Amino acid sequence: MKIAVYGKGGIGKSTTSCNISIALARRGKKVLQIGCDPKHDSTFTLTGFLIPTIIDTLQSKDYHYEDVWPEDVIYKGYGGVDCVEAGGPPAGAGCGGYVVGETVKLLKELNAFYEYDVILFDVLGDVVCGGFAAPLNYADYCIIITDNGFDALFAANRIAASVREKARTHPLRLAGLVGNRTSKRDLIDKYVEACPMPVLEVLPLIEDIRISRVKGKTLFEMAESEPSLDYVCEFYLNIADQLLARPEGVVPKEVPDRELFSLLSDFYLNPANNASSIEQPTDSIVQSEQEPFLII
């Protein structure tokens, strides 16, 4: 299974990706996480340091693939999760999609690409140009990380459009949304009404999620010394269980930009009209089962 994780810049994709990777490993799967961001910090909370990138390694070998060994580019992270950072071209030059392609090419050369039960691509920001949409070419599922805010959901809608476009020629489905660190989900629910898709999980506004990034640890590692965080890990285990069940997923039909702008801005400009939509805090919400949607 191959999963591509997208979302607005700064929304918590890497933190969420690392914890999902650990959750999948806890379920007995062999997991590889590939960071697809020039900052090469996707796997930081798994390894505790910034690992060398594929591009750096290839450059040091003068792009002689035969001189590269698995241990040159694949690093063991917490919980047995293997980690790779694709890296990227110099700022303002080159194409990130090319880098992702070179990464996959090298892993295939090393006979590593097909050795894993799950490969998770953690992709930068909400950039959905052809280059950084490249991981969707390899993915079975896409997950979109969001919060209950206007900007994150607007970005999610653009990513949904990319999934729909890629699904024309690839066996790709949107597994669903993950709400990250949000005390409410009214805007998320309003968006999902307009663009039907599953909501895999909504994580409450937990400060330790943010702190974990600063500490360079996953929530699972922090929970070893702070058992009070075990309940946070359950959110990620729930996401992992849903993914391992091989959901049908959806081919989303994005909301037109102007329509979405009106839909979401109405919640801010006319709060009284939406009083009935205001929900309980997410830590008191029990997610109900959803029938999968398939929209063509």
UniProtKB/Swiss-Prot annotation:
CDD domains: Bchl-like (cd02032)
Lineage: Eukaryota, Viridiplantae, Streptophyta, Chlorokybophyceae, Chlorokybales
Domain of life: Eukaryota
Single GO biological process annotation from the record: photosynthesis, dark reaction
Cysteines joined through disulfide linkages: none
GO cellular component terms, A-Z: chloroplast
PANTHER family found in the cross-reference section: LIGHT-INDEPENDENT PROTOCHLOROPHYLLIDE REDUCTASE IRON-SULFUR ATP-BINDING PROTEIN
Pfam families, sorted: Fer4_NifH
Role summary: Component of the dark-operative protochlorophyllide reductase (DPOR) that uses Mg-ATP and reduced ferredoxin to reduce ring D of protochlorophyllide (Pchlide) to form chlorophyllide a (Chlide). This reaction is light-independent. The L component serves as a unique electron donor to the NB-component of the complex, and binds Mg-ATP.
Its EC number(s): 1.3.7.7
The name this protein goes by in its record: Light-independent protochlorophyllide reductase iron-sulfur ATP-binding protein
Positions with a binding annotation for Mg(2+): 14
GO terms of molecular function: 4 iron, 4 sulfur cluster binding; ATP binding; metal ion binding; oxidoreductase activity, acting on iron-sulfur proteins as donors; oxidoreductase activity, acting on the CH-CH group of donors, iron-sulfur protein as acceptor
Family: Belongs to the NifH/BchL/ChlL family.
Cofactor: [4Fe-4S] cluster
Source organism of this protein record: Chlorokybus atmophyticus
Subcellular location as annotated: Plastid, Chloroplast
